[in-house]
Amino acid sequence: MRRQQRSITDIICENCKYLPTKRGIQKFSFEQNTMMSVQGGLSSLSDSQLTCIFKYCTLQRACV
């Protein structure tokens, strides 16, 4: 099921595919259409990925 409208956070985050969730930072796998927890936590993410997550959190206020 595809959504007609894409949110700005979809556009911001589509390249790094990391999203903050209630279970921590997770990576979205398009192949399996699943969320996977990131091994090693935030320290394993690149600056650009952290920036993406920060923007997502700022816009969505979704960091828990």
From Swiss-Prot:
Pfam families: NinE. Belongs to the ninE family. This is Protein ninE. It comes from Escherichia phage 933W (Bacteriophage 933W). The gene is ninE.
